[in-house]
């Protein structure tokens, strides 16, 4: 806590002194300071918030001679403003009134109850349903010479309580951050580690927070264990230091202990198939190259019925296990779901899954005592639905170990369900302050207060009838006004019949008003019944939250089971709908895909041409040639995606598929520069190629697309040749190598493990038809000029290119210079006639002729014929203006 000198408060009002003390403890955070129905921001915070949120900046009064700049947001809409700020990477301290304004002397007592940061979100309104939010801390380990030897990572999903550790090599940081995708990264003050751009909001915290000894102890305390040996984390000193800082920061933002963080998983890079940032991007797993969410592999696979299943799918896609046993277990479960009997049909199961709430996140909010009434009712209804869900899969659990494990975890926590059923109303209000949250029959005092509040009118009617009968006064009335409260009114002629227990409350000209002990007691209750009922309900709700805390481990157990079942059912639905098959696995080196299809592209087109792909010990590199737009990149990507889907545990789009071990997938596809990093397109390409050449193993799958672009023709060809040779001779990995350098098709003559395949095209009519079929052997041309013509390049440019192509081919055949002279004029002998032997590039048909072919003169009326004549003239003039002959 920051301590300010008395001089800092001189001249400030008591309220502003309170604000300044709070702000001093959160200097880099926007402070939302509660004042009545608004959260106010002051001074620099107000200016910043007004700019970011488009709020009105006002100026009211002065403090210490300085005008007070203010901006505010209504408390009932605060979440939408928090969501905007967090999306911008800002953090917000929520400062609430905790004192009673009626009894406070001076400013009402206030304190920061939580700090909302990009990596510590738990509120449903601030979270994306289908994305996990991670807070990550990183701590660099050094040797005795001060050289960085590793980076310890600790990351936490606060919404679920999942905590993970890992230690990586320093050069693996970018890949790790791309895989984890943290929303917020904690680093020590003074650290020099470069965090890649776009990796997440960065936050500096004191270096002592990363102390290894205290971090290890804090981690043990959090997990309630004596040592970390049981988690395999005892030797991960850097990661333990990061975990200590992470837990300290997360607890501080919540203002309380993290009761739901009770488990730990240590991740090892050898546990998953390696996917570097370029591969995740090029394969468009969860985001397209344009930055959109669809169409991607994730968007195709995500037919999950629960948000938990959707989030688990994202995790599985970014963490494909290397061990095929995990994939086989999942595929066994998919097969069981597809073959289930009618009473356990896939459709019936998915219908039951739609009744399951987001137990994972509700449990997180419950642990932080921030669960709302409808969270608890959703939890209750989910637990009540679990027996029916178990009944759906009961008939098939014996056919799949994964389903048996899920079934066991789906057992509802009976005591927790009983408490929720008895305590929470069937359809509670959204907020406790609105009342109607606690169920009737749970608390006698609350029921009485509600009865008084709700049945006030009936009580008065009953009392009036009883008093008339008791006194014999026929016109006696029981009434109420705001000044005198409840009273019994008796006309002046009947006052002699008034019983002794009547006490005069007011005298009127023609009547007397009385109060009785019974009516006084009722009045005391009735006038404060609603207020007291709300206060009682708030206290009861808080006690229910406390009573539910011991059930958090059981709730977490239940949360994981529907997510996995939902995802397996989604995989089964996709397999059934899209005609996918179960892959097989072998310990032998090789990949065999028969009639494979690109899962995402197939869903976007009417007809997709399936292709085979085969690798083995005698066939390690496929040299792919063929025309532009012929489908080379699609074929390469589909091979990688089918392999990844198989190891994730999904069925795959193919007639059959068999995979040997795969440890990593690399891609060198597409062209993109790195202007911020000062790297050209060619430099980026070579950097990615270097990573592949240095790291690929005989079990790696490598996609190389047109390596060598961006430099001179001969330089590019030489590099492509040398890289292909190195991949064959040294890496011996599975390689798909697409190229337009036809000279490389001679490679199989030197290396029998290389094979030529091509995607063919044929010229037809006035254009070119891409067959998209992969055939053995090399292609004979690239059809680049035909593709340019299809793209709309003007005809004069196409004709000039065709003429110059013939000249360049002639020059290349007759000269042995290291560079072709692209800018010398073709000799006069090389005219258009000499291009006759080149592949025909028919001129685009005249649009007027095309229009005339479609006309039936016998059907034209005179006016239509005249209009058509004008249209034809316009087409001719437009065509001539474009430079056509």
Curated annotation (Swiss-Prot):
<dbReference type="InterPro" id="IPR016151">
    <property type="entry name" value="DNA_mismatch_repair_MutS_N"/>
</dbReference>
<feature type="binding site">
    <location>
        <begin position="626"/>
        <end position="633"/>
    </location>
    <ligand>
        <name>ATP</name>
    </ligand>
</feature>
<dbReference type="InterPro" id="IPR036678">
    <property type="entry name" value="MutS_con_dom_sf"/>
</dbReference>
<comment type="function">
    <text>This protein is involved in the repair of mismatches in DNA. It is possible that it carries out the mismatch recognition step. This protein has a weak ATPase activity.</text>
</comment>
<dbReference type="InterPro" id="IPR017261">
    <property type="entry name" value="DNA_mismatch_repair_MutS/MSH"/>
</dbReference>
<protein>
    <recommendedName>
        <fullName>DNA mismatch repair protein MutS</fullName>
    </recommendedName>
</protein>
<dbReference type="GO" id="GO:0005829">
    <property type="term" value="C:cytosol"/>
</dbReference>
<keyword id="KW-0227">DNA damage</keyword>
<dbReference type="InterPro" id="IPR036187">
    <property type="entry name" value="DNA_mismatch_repair_MutS_sf"/>
</dbReference>
<dbReference type="GO" id="GO:0003684">
    <property type="term" value="F:damaged DNA binding"/>
</dbReference>
<dbReference type="Pfam" id="PF05188">
    <property type="entry name" value="MutS_II"/>
</dbReference>
<dbReference type="GO" id="GO:0030983">
    <property type="term" value="F:mismatched DNA binding"/>
</dbReference>
<dbReference type="GO" id="GO:0006298">
    <property type="term" value="P:mismatch repair"/>
</dbReference>
<dbReference type="InterPro" id="IPR007695">
    <property type="entry name" value="DNA_mismatch_repair_MutS-lik_N"/>
</dbReference>
<dbReference type="GO" id="GO:0005524">
    <property type="term" value="F:ATP binding"/>
</dbReference>
<dbReference type="InterPro" id="IPR000432">
    <property type="entry name" value="DNA_mismatch_repair_MutS_C"/>
</dbReference>
<keyword id="KW-0238">DNA-binding</keyword>
<dbReference type="InterPro" id="IPR007860">
    <property type="entry name" value="DNA_mmatch_repair_MutS_con_dom"/>
</dbReference>
<dbReference type="Pfam" id="PF01624">
    <property type="entry name" value="MutS_I"/>
</dbReference>
<dbReference type="InterPro" id="IPR045076">
    <property type="entry name" value="MutS"/>
</dbReference>
<keyword id="KW-0067">ATP-binding</keyword>
<keyword id="KW-0547">Nucleotide-binding</keyword>
<dbReference type="InterPro" id="IPR007861">
    <property type="entry name" value="DNA_mismatch_repair_MutS_clamp"/>
</dbReference>
<dbReference type="InterPro" id="IPR007696">
    <property type="entry name" value="DNA_mismatch_repair_MutS_core"/>
</dbReference>
<dbReference type="InterPro" id="IPR027417">
    <property type="entry name" value="P-loop_NTPase"/>
</dbReference>
<dbReference type="GO" id="GO:0140664">
    <property type="term" value="F:ATP-dependent DNA damage sensor activity"/>
</dbReference>
<keyword id="KW-0234">DNA repair</keyword>
<dbReference type="InterPro" id="IPR005748">
    <property type="entry name" value="DNA_mismatch_repair_MutS"/>
</dbReference>
<comment type="similarity">
    <text>Belongs to the DNA mismatch repair MutS family.</text>
</comment>
<dbReference type="Pfam" id="PF05190">
    <property type="entry name" value="MutS_IV"/>
</dbReference>
<dbReference type="Pfam" id="PF05192">
    <property type="entry name" value="MutS_III"/>
</dbReference>
<dbReference type="Pfam" id="PF00488">
    <property type="entry name" value="MutS_V"/>
</dbReference>
């Amino acid at each position: 806590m920051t301590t300010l000198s008395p001089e800092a408060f001189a001249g400030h009002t008591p309220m502003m002194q309170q604000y300044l003390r709070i702000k001093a403890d959160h200097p880099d955070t926007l402070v939302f300071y509660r004042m009545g129905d608004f959260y106010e921001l002051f001074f620099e915070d107000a200016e910043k918030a007004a700019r970011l949120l488009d709020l009105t900046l006002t100026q009211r009064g002065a403090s210490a001679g300085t005008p007070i700049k203010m901006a505010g947001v209504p408390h009932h809409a605060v979440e939408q403003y928090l969501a905007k700020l967090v999306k911008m990477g800002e953090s917000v301290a929520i400062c609430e009134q905790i004192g009673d304004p009626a009894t406070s002397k001076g400013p009402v007592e206030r304190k920061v109850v939580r700090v909302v940061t990009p990596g510590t979100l738990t509120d449903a309104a601030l979270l994306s349903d289908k994305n996990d939010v991670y807070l990550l801390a990183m701590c660099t380990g050094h040797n005795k010479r001060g050289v960085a030897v590793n980076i310890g990572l600790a990351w936490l999903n606060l919404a679920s309580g999942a905590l993970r550790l890992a230690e990586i090599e320093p050069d693996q940081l970018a890949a790790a951050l791309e895989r984890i995708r943290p929303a917020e990264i904690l680093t020590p003050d003074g650290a020099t580690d470069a965090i890649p751009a776009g990796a997440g909001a960065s936050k500096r915290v004191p270096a002592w927070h990363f102390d290894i000894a205290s971090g290890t102890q804090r981690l043990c305390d959090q997990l309630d264990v004596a040592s970390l040996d049981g988690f395999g984390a005892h030797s991960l000193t850097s990661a333990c230091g990061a975990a200590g800082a992470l837990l300290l920061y997360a607890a501080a933002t919540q203002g309380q202990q993290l009761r739901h963080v009770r488990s730990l998983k240590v991740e090892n890079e050898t546990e998953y198939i390696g996917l570097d940032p370029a591969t995740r991007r090029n394969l468009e797993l969860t985001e397209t190259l344009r930055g959109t969410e669809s169409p991607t592999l994730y968007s195709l696979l995500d037919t999950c019925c629960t948000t938990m299943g959707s989030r688990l799918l994202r995790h599985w896609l970014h963490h494909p296990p290397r061990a095929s046993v995990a994939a086989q277990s999942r595929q066994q479960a998919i097969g069981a779901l597809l073959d289930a009997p009618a009473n356990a049909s896939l459709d019936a199961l998915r219908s039951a899954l739609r009744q399951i709430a987001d137990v994972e996140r509700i449990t997180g909010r419950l642990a932080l005592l921030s669960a709302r009434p409808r969270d608890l009712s959703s939890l209750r209804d989910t637990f009540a639905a679990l027996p029916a869900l178990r009944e759906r899969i009961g008939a098939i659990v014996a056919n799949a170990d994964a389903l048996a494990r899920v079934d066991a975890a789906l057992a509802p926590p009976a005591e927790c369900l009983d408490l929720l059923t008895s305590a929470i109303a069937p359809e509670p209000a959204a907020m406790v302050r609105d009342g109607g949250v606690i169920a009737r029959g749970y608390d006698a005092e609350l029921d009485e207060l509600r009865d008084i509040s709700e049945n006030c009118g009936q009580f008065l009617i009953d009392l009036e009838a009883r008093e008339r009968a008791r006194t014999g006064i026929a016109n006696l009335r029981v009434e109420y006004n705001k000044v005198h409260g409840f009273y019994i009114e008796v006309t002046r002629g009947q006052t002699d019949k008034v019983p002794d227990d009547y006490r005069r409350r007011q005298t009127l000209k023609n009547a007397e008003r009385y109060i009785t002990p019974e009516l006084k007691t009722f009045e005391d209750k009735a006038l404060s019944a609603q207020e007291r009922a709300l206060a009682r309900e708030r206290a009861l709700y808080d006690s229910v939250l406390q009573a539910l805390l011991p059930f958090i481990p059981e709730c977490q157990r239940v949360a994981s089971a529907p997510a996995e079942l939902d995802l397996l059912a989604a995989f089964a639905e996709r397999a059934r709908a899209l005609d996918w098959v179960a892959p097989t696995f072998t310990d032998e080196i090789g990949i065999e895909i028969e009639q494979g299809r690109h899962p995402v592209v197939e869903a976007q087109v009417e007809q997709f041409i399936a292709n085979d792909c085969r690798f083995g010990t005698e066939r390690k590199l496929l040299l792919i040639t063929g025309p532009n737009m012929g489908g080379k990149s699609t074929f390469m990507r589909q091979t990688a995606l089918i392999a990844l889907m198989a190891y994730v545990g999904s069925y795959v789009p193919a007639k059959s598929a068999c995979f040997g071990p795969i440890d990593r997938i690399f891609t060198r596809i597409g062209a993109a520069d790195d202007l911020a990093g000062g790297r050209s397109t060619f430099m980026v390409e070579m950097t990615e190629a270097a990573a592949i050449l240095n790291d690929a193993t005989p079990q790696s799958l490598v996609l190389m697309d047109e390596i060598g672009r961006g430099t001179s023709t001969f330089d590019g060809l030489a590099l492509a040749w040398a890289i292909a040779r190195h991949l064959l001779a040294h890496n011996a990995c599975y390689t798909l190598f697409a190229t337009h350098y036809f000279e490389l098709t001679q490679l199989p003559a030197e290396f029998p493990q290389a094979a030529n395949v091509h995607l063919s095209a044929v010229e037809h009519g006035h254009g070119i038809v891409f067959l998209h079929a992969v055939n053995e052997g090399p292609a004979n041309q690239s059809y680049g000029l035909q593709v340019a013509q299809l793209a709309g390049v003007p005809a004069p440019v196409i004709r000039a290119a065709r003429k110059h192509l013939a000249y360049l081919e002639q020059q290349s055949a007759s000269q042995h210079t290291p560079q072709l002279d692209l800018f010398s004029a073709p000799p006069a002998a090389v005219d258009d006639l000499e291009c006759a032997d080149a592949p025909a590039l028919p001129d685009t048909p005249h649009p007027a002729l095309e229009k005339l072919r479609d006309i039936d003169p016998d059907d034209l009326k005179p006016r239509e014929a005249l209009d058509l004549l004008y249209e034809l003239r316009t087409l001719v003039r437009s065509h001539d203006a474009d430079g056509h002959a």
